[in-house]
Curated annotation (Swiss-Prot):
This is 1-phosphatidylinositol 4,5-bisphosphate phosphodiesterase delta-1. Changing K441Q: Decreases on hydrolysis inositol phospholipids. It comes from the Eukaryota. The gene is PLCD1. The modification Phosphothreonine is found at T457. The modification Phosphoserine is found at S460. The active site is at H311, H356. GO terms for molecular function: calcium ion binding; GTPase activating protein binding; phosphatidic acid binding; phosphatidylinositol-4,5-bisphosphate binding; phosphatidylinositol-4,5-bisphosphate phospholipase C activity; phosphatidylserine binding. Its EC number is 3.1.4.11. Residues 492-609 form the PI-PLC Y-box domain. It catalyses: a 1,2-diacyl-sn-glycero-3-phospho-(1D-myo-inositol-4,5-bisphosphate) + H2O = 1D-myo-inositol 1,4,5-trisphosphate + a 1,2-diacyl-sn-glycerol + H(+); a 1,2-diacyl-sn-glycero-3-phospho-(1D-myo-inositol) + H2O = 1D-myo-inositol 1-phosphate + a 1,2-diacyl-sn-glycerol + H(+). Changing K440Q: No effect on hydrolysis inositol phospholipids. Interacts with TGM2. Its cofactor is Ca(2+).
Length: 756
């Protein structure tokens, strides 16, 4: 039952010095402010999955003193968070480290007694995170179940009494009536000692993890045999999985990759265990493995791509009084975001600051944000990052901004047009590793050659902070001075190359040329929706050659989001959402940008790139986009669904909703029945049929909720997949958490077919 020892042995880490130090534990200084440093004991638990932290809170619970390795986003050495940068400058960097979590919770800033202790923690955690990520689905399942067994073994005798068995089933999120639990217990208790140990626990584990639906699927493919031959596997891949590359080569590679039995592998066969390993793997996922890498043409103009974009990136919470943080930029970049917003204002000591103007959100230094962007811009993707500047600074502080941009970003910053690219927007491929500024600019694309002098007066049209239309909102923000003119420093203007901010003056027409290719307008969600309603095709055609940025309405002071789908349907590229706010809008957003290797750029369909096209998302007619498909999805079962209530006795009642997002004609939703008291292996076996007419714009969202008859259902997990990335056949859908991180073991088992 020692899952930790199994983990260390599996990865050859049983004698690792760093991990032994973590298992022993150590006293560390926890830092919260300049006046709050407290010594606390931290220790890696034996399961190698959780960290125990000493707490002196009066209302502490055992659960509150633990955090999971799976919740860690990153471990940073030195003064590399706002907390340590502000409050631990007196301590050498080699003793400082930070644990950054995936969700919105605070970073854990720590000081070790010595550089060696800090190294043990940083290297040890890196090793566990790396090796946990490399575990296959079966290993994760085993590790998780063994961890639950260890928790249930209250007296730590490596045996399981009937009472401990009941606790174990609750840990697994399954409610079994006592008579059935007693029946399983007796079947496995071969020694008749009224407790399970060693092989008896293994027998119980096998009985628990047996999946009837996998047995049935395997029997369909193997007939009466105990294994699949290469020919049988090829037939399954062709007829059920609809794999384009189905053939002996693919079958043999799957056997080599997933078959655990060396005997079967040598005989070029796949056992049921190997079959399950394949179905749980990336090859058996409902999301196309080929689309997990960059596969699209990256050589087209920027305006031909959807761009993952964040609104008011600096905010961690609401738009009126929440905190601003450099961590928000890091989180967005790590999620593949390629367009960030910087709302710049004059700060004290001649240092520009970033915050949501006219509100009470906290303030951060412009230079600190640039350093965070420099360090993280290209960790998740090599393709260009666009910094959307909302500039409210005086000339003097604009020049400080320009100096910081030059000094901190250096050669990353694009500060002149690319050679030979002066008539159209460059491509993501041409701009790899580059950071572009979007903002006000004096003159045209090329340097003005002295025209206009060192500064000029231009109209500021993107003052989103002043767009607080609602009276209730206006009463809660600071008074906006009456000023609609901005004096722009030449030094800052010259750094804006291909993304010059302009007022939208209407679509181009004969005799009215409209915007230059390097000029772009921003639209509130409401204005964009009006343009789509009044001139859908005009907006689509405008977006073939020009970038358009969409941002949330001013009344969304709670940082809520609008649906990005309608904007994408109109060809809008920079559809900015509040990344800090989880919900269905961000689920769909993350699903769209999971495509093309999650690089932050997704090529628009051909009909949204045609300057003479006739597509209108609000008045759908026949055209090259019309490709009627019949989509059948059978939701068969769920696996290891997480608890939503921290109450240990609470078991989920899961239901699944399958949603279609796309053009209005394709939008649809279907629901399964509710399965009571079973989050471990619920069974639905329910089929849904959908008709989709514009598949290139459709996304499929699988939503799993805990049903509640008296209030709103609780979110359990979801996965959103572009229809063009959806694989056919028997597949596992790997569920994501509320914050967009993948659950380690939670899946749906489905069968998918897509026909013309």
């Amino acid at each position: 039952m020692d899952s930790g020892r199994d983990f260390l042995t599996l990865h050859g880490l049983q004698d690792d010095e760093d991990l032994q130090a973590l298992l022993k534990g150590s006293q560390l200084l926890k830092v919260k402010s300049s006046s709050w440093r407290r010594e606390r004991f931290y220790k890696l638990q034996e399961d190698c999955k959780t960290i125990w932290q000493e707490s002196r809170k009066v209302m502490r619970t055992p659960e509150s003193q633990l955090f999971s390795i799976e919740d860690i986003q990153e471990v940073r050495m030195g003064h590399r968070t706002e907390g340590l940068e502000k409050f631990a400058r007196d301590v050498p960097e080699d003793r400082c480290f930070s644990i950054v979590f995936k969700d919105q919770r605070n970073t854990l800033d720590l000081i070790a007694p010595s550089p060696a202790d800090a190294q043990h923690w940083v290297l040890g955690l890196h090793k566990i995170i790396h090796h946990s990520g490399s575990m296959d689905q079966r290993q994760k399942l085993q590790h998780w179940i063994h961890s639950c067994l260890r928790k249930a073994d209250k007296n730590k005798d490596n045996k399981m009494s009937f009472k401990e068995l009941q606790n174990f089933l609750k840990e697994l999120n399954i409610q079994v009536d006592d008579s059935y639990a007693r029946k399983i217990f007796r079947e496995c208790d071969h020694s008749q000692t009224d407790s399970l140990e060693d092989e008896e626990i293994e027998a119980f584990y096998k009985m628990l993890t047996q999946r009837v639906e996998i047995d049935r699927t395997f029997a369909e493919a193997a007939g009466s045999g105990e294994t699949l031959s290469v020919d049988q596997l090829v037939t399954f891949l062709q007829h059920q999985q609809r794999e384009e590359a189905a053939g002996p080569a693919l079958a043999l590679s799957l056997i080599e990759r997933y078959e655990p039995s060396e005997t079967a592998k040598a005989q070029r066969q796949m056992t049921k265990d190997g079959f399950l390993m394949y179905l749980l793997s990336a090859d058996g996922s409902a999301f196309s493995l080929a689309h997990r890498r960059v596969y699209q043409d990256m050589g087209q103009p920027l305006s031909h791509y959807l761009v993952s974009s964040s609104h008011n990136t600096y905010l961690l919470e609401d738009q009126l009084a929440g905190p601003s943080s450099t961590e928000a930029y890091i989180r967005a970049l790590c999620k593949g975001c390629r367009c960030l917003e910087l709302d710049c204002w004059d700060g004290p000591n001649q240092e520009p600051i970033i915050y949501h103007g006219y509100t009470f959100t906290s303030k951060i230094l412009f230079c600190d944000v640039l350093r965070a962007i420099r360090d993280y811009a290209f960790k998740a993707s090599p393709y260009p990052v666009i910094l959307s500047l909302e500039n409210h600074c005086t000339l003097e502080q604009q020049r400080v901004m320009a100096r910081h941009l030059h000094a901190i970003l250096g050669p990353m910053l694009l500060n002149r047009p690319l050679d030979g690219v002066t008539n159209s927007l460059p491509s993501p491929e041409q701009l790899k590793g580059k950071i572009l500024l979007k903002g006000k600019k004096l003159g045209g694309l090329l340097p003005p050659g002295g025209e206009g002098g060192p500064e000029a007066t231009v109209v500021s049209d993107e003052d989103e902070a002043a767009e607080m239309e609602d009276e209730a909102v206006r009463s809660r923000v600071q008074h906006k001075p009456k000023e609609d003119k901005l004096r722009l420093a030449q030094e800052l203007s010259d750094m804006v190359i291909y993304c010059k901010s302009v007022h939208f003056g209407g679509f181009s027409s004969p005799g009215t040329p409209g915007q230059a290719f390097y000029e772009m307008a921003s639209f509130s969600e409401n204005r964009a929706l009006r343009l789509l309603q009044e001139s859908g095709n005009g907006f689509v055609r405008h977006n073939v050659g020009h970038l358009s940025r969409i941002y949330p309405a001013g009344w969304r002071t709670d940082s809520s989001n609008y649906s990005p789908v309608e904007m994408w349907n109109g060809g809008c590229q920079i559809v900015a959402l509040n990344f800090q706010t989880p919900g269905p809008e961000m689920d769909v957003y993350q699903g769209r940008f999971q495509d093309n290797g999650a690089c932050g750029y997704v090529l628009k369909p051909a009909f949204l790139r045609d300057p003479n096209g006739t597509f209108n998302p609000r008045a759908l007619a026949q055209g090259p986009w019309w490709a009627r498909k019949r989509l059948n999805i059978r939701v068969i079962s769920g696996q290891q669904l997480p608890k939503v209530n921290k109450n240990k006795n609470s078991i989920v009642d899961p239901k699944v909703t399958v949603e279609i997002h796309g053009v209005s004609r394709d939008v649809a939703s279907r629901q399964t029945a509710v399965i009571t008291n079973n989050g471990f292996n619920p069974w639905w076996d329910t089929e849904f049929a959908f008709e989709v007419v514009v598949p290139d714009l459709a996304l499929i969202r699988f939503l799993v909720e805990d049903y509640d008859a008296s209030s709103k259902n609780d979110f359990i997990g979801q996965s959103t997949i572009p229809l063009n990335s959806l694989k056919q056949g028997y597949r596992h859908v790997h569920l994501m958490s509320k914050n967009g991180d993948q659950h380690p073991s939670a899946t749906l088992f489905v069968k998918i077919s897509l026909q013309d």
